[in-house]
Each structure stands twice: as C-alpha cells, then as structure tokens.
Amino acid sequence: MKLDFPVMLAMLLLAAAIQTLLPSFHGGELALKAPLLPSVAIYYVLERQRPLGIFAALWAGILTDALGGVPPGTSSFGLLAAALLFFALRKFLPEASWLIPAAAGAIVAVFLALLQYAVLRARCGFDAPFYLLFRPLLVIVPFAAVVTMAVVAAARRIDLMAGNTEPRKEVAEP
C-alpha cells in the first residue's frame, strides 16, 4: 500500500509548522517568510504524478494564505499556475538535476511575492510602495533556492523510506 497522501499531509503540516516558527525577512512594511510550503508543492509537481502535484499545490497555497494573512486563494492560484507551467515543462527538464528545483523555488518565491503584493494592494488597500519589495526579494531568492533544494532532498528521502518511490539510477551502468 502506497502512503502518498499521508506522507504528503505530514510534509505539508511539518512545513507549515516550521514556516510559522521561522522569522520573516522584513523590508519596511513588507515581510516575506521562508517558502517551505511552496517547496513541498514544487517537489510534488516536479517529481511525482500530476494529481499529487495539483493536490500539493492547492493545499500548500491554502496553508500559505492562512499563515500569511493574504486573501484566501491568492497563493493557491499562484502555485496552481506555477504547477501547470512546470507540468508542461517537465518532459524537457533533466530528472536528477539539483538546479531545476533550486531555480523553480526561486522563480515561485518571486512570483508568489509579486502576486501577494498585487492582491494586497488591489483588494486590501495595502499602500506600501513597490520598491520596498526589492530588498526582501534579494534575500528570499537565494534563500528560496537553498530551501527548495533541502526540502526536495528531504521529501525524496521520506518518500523512498515510505515506499512511495523507487531509488534513482543516477549513475549509468557499464
């Protein structure tokens, strides 16, 4: 019996708990958190079946919005849009590369920060100037890349231990 959904639920809840406890990167009135929940979604989108990726993106977005104080659906929309893009590109991306999850984490972090800023500005009367977003983004982009690589490595290991995935053959056989 595969434990896909229980393992995903555990990873999402653990990521939510850790993301809540970690400090924010402040830039004036703006604060960005370490993107642990989007990193879990990126793992499922890049490495697992499509239904698991969609489910992970949806719930990572719901939890991100609930913990971050942005209008419900904002991060879910952003993560689902990113998931569809990465699903379309997945057949062209190398499987065993660490660069792909790192780049995806950085791209998704920037996309979500810009989307959340736009929604807060349009729907909630948030009036912080756009340039205040640059300093936190300069910090969060490399941090998101590293966090995503770490989360993907941990998620691969957990799924392997749970019997959800098979070991990779990353070295060509003679």
Can you name each region flagged by the protein language model?
Residues 1-174:
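Terminal, non-globular segments
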